[in-house]
UniProtKB/Swiss-Prot annotation:
The keyword Transcription regulation does not apply. GO terms for molecular function: ATP binding; glutaminase activity; metal ion binding; NAD+ synthase (glutamine-hydrolyzing) activity; NAD+ synthase activity. One of its GO terms (cellular component) is cytoplasm. Catalyzes the ATP-dependent amidation of deamido-NAD to form NAD. Uses ammonia as a nitrogen source. It holds the Pfam family NAD_synthase. This is NH(3)-dependent NAD(+) synthetase. It comes from Lactobacillus johnsonii (strain CNCM I-12250 / La1 / NCC 533). Homodimer.
Length: 277
C-alpha cells in the first residue's frame, strides 16, 4: 500500500472483505449498546433521503429498537424516520420506498423550504450574497436542526449516515449531515453497505441508484462521483487496501488532506493537524 493509503485505511477501519450478516449484527449491537449505556435515551432519529446510506442506517436502527423493546419490555423505545424535502423532492418515491422497507415506528415529513428561504432572505438583507452552494449547506444544516429538535422532544439521539467512503473526503456539510450522535456505518465502504442491504432484502433500486447530494439547485442531480472526481469503485478499492491508478490515488489523497478539518472538533491552540498538510 501507499504510505498515506495505509494511514487512511487504519483511520477508517475498513476491512478488505466483510461478512454482511456479521456486520449487520455488529451495527445493531452497537446501536443497542449505546442505548443501554445511556438509559435516558429512548429514541433514535434519522433523516431519510431514499439513498443507500440512510436506507441502510434506518433499517439497522429499526431492528435495534425492536430488539430493545423485546429484550426490556419497554415500549417507549422508538425509531423516528424523518423525510426532509426542500419543496418537492424529485425522488420522493424512493424515500417512500425506503420508509416502507424500514417500517419505522414513526414516519415524519418536515419541509425545510420555508426556514431555509427565510434564513437566506435575512442574511442577504445585510448585503451578503448567498451562493447556490452556500444555500445547499444551509439546507443540510437546517435538516440537522430539525432532527435535533425532534430528538430533543423524544429523549432521543440523532443517527448519522457517515461511512468510510464518505468520511475520507469530508463529503458532507460540516455541522450539517456531518453532525450526529452516533454513526453505525463508520468502518464500511460503499460496496460493503450495498452488500448489507442485499442481505437485508432491500429493493434493488434503492442501492443501485447513482448517489447524489441533491443540495444545489443549479445542479440538483450532480452525481457524487462527478463532485468527488473519482469513482466509488476506486474509493472502495483504495480503502480496502487494493491498488488503484495513480490518478485515482492522488485524487483520493488530495480529498483526504483538504477535508482534514472536518474530522476534528473545532481547532484549539493545542492542535497542529492543520499544519501537516
Amino acid at each position: 500500500m501507499r504510505p498515506l493509503q495505509e494511514k487512511i485505511v487504519a483511520y477508517e477501519h475498513v476491512l478488505p472483505e466483510i461478512d454482511p450478516k456479521k456486520e449487520i449484527r455488529k451495527s445493531i449491537d452497537f446501536l443497542k449498546d449505546y442505548l443501554k449505556e445511556n438509559p435516558f435515551l429512548k429514541t433514535y432519529v434519522l433523516g431519510i433521503s431514499g439513498g443507500q446510506d440512510s436506507t441502510l442506517t434506518g433499517k439497522l436502527c429499526q431492528m435495534a429498537i425492536e430488539e430493545m423493546r423485546e429484550e426490556t419490555g419497554n415500549k417507549s423505545y422508538q425509531f423516528i424516520a424523518v423525510r426532509l424535502p426542500y419543496g418537492v423532492q424529485a425522488d420522493a418515491s424512493d424515500a417512500a420506498d425506503a420508509i416502507a422497507f424500514q417500517k419505522p415506528d414513526q414516519d415524519l415529513i418536515v419541509n425545510i423550504k420555508e426556514p431555509v428561504d427565510a434564513m437566506v432572505k435575512v442574511v442577504e438583507a445585510t448585503g451578503q450574497k448567498i451562493t447556490d452552494f452556500n444555500k445547499g449547506n444551509i439546507k443540510a444544516r437546517q435538516r440537522m436542526v430539525v432532527q435535533y429538535a425532534i430528538a430533543g422532544a423524544n429523549n432521543g439521539a440523532v443517527v448519522g449516515t457517515d461511512h468510510a467512503a464518505e468520511n475520507f473526503s469530508g463529503f458532507y456539510t460540516k455541522y450539517g449531515d456531518g453532525a450526529a450522535d452516533i454513526t453505525p456505518l463508520f468502518r464500511l465502504d460503499k460496496r460493503q453497505g450495498k452488500a448489507m442491504l442485499k442481505e437485508l432484502g432491500c429493493p434493488k433500486h434503492l442501492y443501485e441508484k447513482a448517489p447524489t447530494a441533491d443540495l444545489e439547485e443549479d445542479r440538483p442531480d450532480l452525481p457524487d462521483e462527478v463532485a468527488l472526481g473519482v469513482t466509488y469503485k476506486d474509493v472502495d478499492d483504495y480503502l480496502e487496501g487494493k491498488d488503484v491508478s495513480e490518478e485515482a490515488a492522488e485524487q483520493i489523497e488530495k480529498l483526504w488532506k483538504k477535508s482534514e478539518h472536518k474530522r476534528h472538533l473545532p481547532v484549539t491552540i493545542f492542535d497542529d493537524f492543520y499544519k501537516q498538510n
